[in-house]
Amino acid sequence: MLYLRLFTQGRNQVQTVNIYFLDIGGLMRKLTEEEKRVIINRGTEPPFSGKYNDFFKNGTYICKQCGAPLFRSESKFKSGCGWPSFDEEIKGAIKRLKDEDGIRTEIVCSNCGAHLGHVFEGEGFTLKNTRHCVNSISLDFIPDNR
């Protein structure tokens, strides 16, 4: 993430303006307030609100913040929890951290540390018995047929 701090000088004051940009596939774009709330401040988008919750095209889900590949569409499944669910990450793409509540396990992009969601095990949704519960707002999607 590129963080740019601009200083503008008025009559008797200096004003600071912070601008956040994300590099997605080589394109720089401004991070929205909602994206900052979830990706940087470790928030959660409302259930059933994300664009990838009921999205099942073939391709790769990438980190919205840095563009690193995170999940393949073959690992996505319908869990009914309200967020995109994956039973396997791309090897080395995800880092697991103990959540502040001491119960859940947070998942972040291993490349840039962007908050993705949480991982749960032992629920029996798939044979792999793992559910990565991910905020859609933390993801972008690259279709296989580009």
Question: What residue ranges belong to the model's regions?
Answer:
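Iron-sulfur (Fe-S) cluster-binding modules
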Residues: L6
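Short Gly/Ser/Thr- and charged-rich N-terminal loops/segments
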Residues: Q9
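Intrinsic-disorder-associated, low-complexity terminal segments enriched in Asp/Asn/His/Tyr and depleted
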Residues: Y3, N12, N18-Y20
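A short Gly-Trp-Pro
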Residues: N18, D23-R146
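Initiator methionine at the very start of the polypeptide chain
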Residues: M1, V14, G26-M28
